[in-house]
Amino acid sequence: NLVQHVQGGVLDREKLARTIKTAVRMLDNVIDINYYAVPQAKNSNLKHRPVGMGIMGFQDALYEMGIAYGSDEAVDFADESMEVISYYAIQTSSDLALERGAYSTFKGSLWDQGILPIDSLELVAKSRPERMFEVDRTQRLDWDSLRAKVQKDGMRNSNVMAIAPTATISNICGVSQSIEPTFQNLYVKSNLSGEFTVINPYLVRALKERGLWDTVMVNDLKHFEGSVQKIARIPEELKAIFATAFEVEPRWIVDAASRRQKW
């Protein structure tokens, strides 16, 4: 839950690192205590021990920082947050290898060869013309030391990250889904208890702070189905921040994904 790791408008790296260390240990435990319907699945999991830790609440984190999804700042934050997650996930898996042993097929793997996910960019670049591979390769953490540690101590898990849609669990936690922009600021949700209206709490808070939350605004939001783009009273800054999925230029979503995938 990325938004829980934003403090004072910035990413709390120390808290995020602590969360990741706990999460990776938990996921590794699941491999051993899980129920497997077929022996092939059990054998594969115990042999390679892959886990997939992802994120949710990315859009909420941007709301907390006052950043529009369609901006360079959002792309940079996507890069920074995923680097921190990747770094400490790999580090924790390597620590677990010391404690519990490396996964059985570690020898000869890319990890064993000192090839981390960030290093795979170089392999791709060699196979493509330079003009077709323009990817930001900025690094903020000490990857050389981590690379050496992985080669020396091994890895407990063959894979450590996977970004899931989190469609259900994000609703349970009350945050935005996965790494996606908000689908709508206002919508009707249905379950066995009936139908109820859900409105973006960050939008309500921002409007209240500016003295814009009143009956007229409520009716305007209903009329435009949660979109703020055609409501004249709302400042352009808020229109950018609270743009919904189909109002954000696709290139920003692709740029953010491009930055994340290198980790």
Residue ranges and their predicted role:
Residues 7-13, 40-44, 72-82, 184-194:
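Short beta-alpha connecting loops at secondary-structure transitions
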